[in-house]
Each structure stands twice: as C-alpha cells, then as structure tokens.
C-alpha cells in the first residue's frame, strides 16, 4: 500500500478489503496495523487511492467497529473532510461511512456528539451538483416527446428511502477486478459518444452522493429521532425559503428523508409545512415539483387524517396537487406524481371514495397523455 505506483497501492487495498468483508481471522489479528496503514494513505495525492481508503474504513466499521473506536474522532474528522472531496467518487465512498455508522447501534454513543457536524455536511451534499444537472440535460417540459427505447426499463418505486437502489448497487460493488481498477486510472481520457450517452442515461437512476447522503439522513432520523431536529430544522428553514431553486429542492428532499423517523416530532410543524409543500408543486422547476411529490408521499399518513376538518384543510389540497402533477407536462414529474398518489391512496383506503370522480378524470386524461414508460406506472 506504500508502493510508488498508485495502481499497486489501489490493488493492495482492494485485495485486503476482501479479507475484511469475509471476517478473516488473520485480518482481524492484524487489523490495528492495517488501520494504521489506512491513516498513512488517507492523504494520498491520487483520488482513487483515497476512494479505496474510505471504502476500507467502511468495511472495517461494518465488520470490526471496535477496531476503529479508539481512533473514532480522527476517523470522523477524515470522513467529514472526504465527504466534501472535490472528487465525487471519493465523496460517495466517504458518505457510505455515515450510512454504515448510523446503522450500527453499538456506535450510537460515539455518533451522537458528532450529529451537529455531520448533519450540515449531509445536507450540503444533497444539493444537485453542476455535473449532475449537466448530465440530466434539458429538464423542462417533455411530455409531448415519445419515449426512447432506453427509457423503458425497470425502476424502484415507493418503499424505504433509496434502500433498494443502494442494495442493488452494493451487490456488485464489493470487489473490483484488476481491469476495472486499471480502467479507473484512465478517467481523464476522452469518452466516446456511446459511453457518454450511457452515462447520461444512467444519471437519474444511479446511486450517487446526493442519494447516499439523503439515505444517511433517513437512517439518522430513524436512530436518533427528535435529537436531530435542533440541528436540522434551522438549516431546513433556510433552504425551503431560499431564492435558489437548487437549495429549495435539497431542503424538500431532506424534509422527506426524515419523515419516517421523525414523524411524531414533526407533527407540530406539518400544519405549516404541508401547505408550503402544496405550494411548491407550482414551482417552475420540474425537479422541485418532482421531489415535492415524493416528500408529500412520505407524509401521506398524516395528510390522510380521519377528521373531516383535517381532510378538508390538508388532504384535499394534497390530493388535488398530486393529481395536477399526474398531468404535468414533464415526464419526471408525472412519474413522481403517480408514485406519490399511489402512496396516498394506500393510506386513505376506502375513504377515497368521495373523491373518485376527480381521481378518475385525472387518470383518464393521463391515459391520453402518457407515453409507454409512464403508462406502465399509471397501470
């Protein structure tokens, strides 16, 4: 791992990581020495080496968390720094650390005092990067454009916060072949047109830094519940009322991410937040409308309250707003609107009966408007 050739350093780290994953007794016996080596390589000049250092620390945390306990303050400092690395591959591997950290109940006492520093970093990294926006291309009205064949592929809808995407990604990310690692060293080479097209197509559905940080915030909310709110709510307020739509979008994403873990403690704020979110459905930016649909879906259990006054004040505007998004002129928003409406429908159950007329009108209009991909969701 100290070899002059960065390729050799990466291959060494990658090889040793496999022994961590299987809980090798020989690796356990030498773990202190290995952790010391990781600290030596933590400031390596090559981003790909730092990426594998972060990956190794995540593996150690998941397999032998007690080995990191004595140096946890230093590890936290390093991971906070690396989560904000200019190289997104490094940042993503570092962000995985917070996801693993939050899912490890044995470390909750060590994680708790660091929440005021971790939460702002996660929120910062949930903002769309310029590269992500560039790779998504034109995100304006596209409902009249026919679907491309590559657009029609399986996607995960609803359920736990991005967990299925992360699990799918993780199944193939544990071990990298020598050829795959060597290819990573050629990132500065020019892409051919087909490779670039593939990357553009995969951007929206791929596991990335933004989704990883949102998932980490979700798990932190499940683990610590009301304890995260004093640090999070002031930051959310700033973002939700920001003039910059990218900041607003990230704030709405964060609000949805904490829904499952903090629903009881967020309840006093929802009479203000739900109307605000309904208003966000009229935002000129499709990505804001799309994420607002998702977040409203996350709070659908509260919106579907049984009291008639509650339903008139909150449920009806949410239902009308989501049906409008089902008929939006942007395909991404249509998709999010359908998914959120399906979630709301499940929460309401038979109580939806009085509203069937507008629901059916919207769905019939959607059948006339949708192309093949969103038609599958509509069914």
Predicted regions and their residues:
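Karyopherin-beta/Importin-beta family HEAT-repeat alpha-solenoid scaffold
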Residues: 1-379
């Amino acid at each position: 791992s100290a070899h002059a050739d960065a390729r050799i350093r990466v291959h060494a780290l990658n090889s040793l990581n496999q022994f961590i994953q299987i809980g090798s007794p020989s690796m356990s016996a030498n773990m202190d020495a290995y952790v010391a080596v990781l600290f030596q390589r933590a400031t390596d000049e090559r981003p790909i080496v730092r990426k594998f250092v972060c990956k190794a620390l995540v593996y150690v945390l998941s397999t032998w968390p007690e080995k990191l306990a004595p140096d946890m303050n230093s590890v936290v400092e390093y991971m906070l720094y690396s989560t904000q690395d200019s190289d997104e591959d490094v940042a993503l591997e570092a962000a995985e650390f917070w996801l693993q950290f939050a899912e490890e109940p044995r470390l909750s006492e060590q994680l708790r005092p660091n929440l005021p520093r971790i939460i702002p970093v996660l929120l910062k990294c949930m903002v769309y990067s310029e590269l992500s926006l560039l790779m998504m291309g034109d995100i304006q009205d596209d409902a009249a454009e026919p679907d491309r064949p590559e657009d029609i592929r399986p996607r995960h809808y609803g359920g736990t916060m991005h967990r299925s995407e992360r699990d799918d990604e993780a199944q193939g990310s544990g071990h990298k072949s020598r050829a795959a690692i060597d290819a990573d060293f050629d990132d500065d080479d020019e892409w051919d047109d087909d490779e670039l097209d593939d990357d553009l197509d995969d951007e929206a559905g791929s596991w990335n830094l933004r989704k990883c940080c949102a998932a980490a915030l979700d798990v932190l909310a499940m683990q610590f519940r009301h304890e995260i709110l004093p640090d999070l709510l002031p930051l959310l307020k700033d973002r939700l009322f920001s003039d910059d739509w990218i900041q607003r979008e990230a704030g709405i994403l964060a609000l949805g991410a904490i829904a499952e873990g903090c629903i009881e403690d967020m309840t006093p704020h929802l009479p203000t937040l739900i109307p605000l979110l309904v208003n966000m459905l009229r935002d000129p930016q499709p990505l804001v409308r799309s994420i607002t649909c998702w977040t409203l879906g996350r709070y659908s259990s509260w919106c579907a309250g049984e009291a008639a006054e509650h339903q008139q004040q909150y449920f009806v505007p949410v239902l009308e707003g989501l049906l409008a998004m089902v008929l939006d002129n942007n395909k991404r928003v249509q998709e999010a609107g359908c998914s959120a409406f399906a979630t709301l429908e499940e929460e309401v159950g038979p109580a939806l009966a009085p509203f069937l007329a507008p629901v059916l009108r919207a769905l019939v209009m959607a059948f006339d408007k949708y192309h093949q991909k969103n038609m599958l969701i509509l069914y």
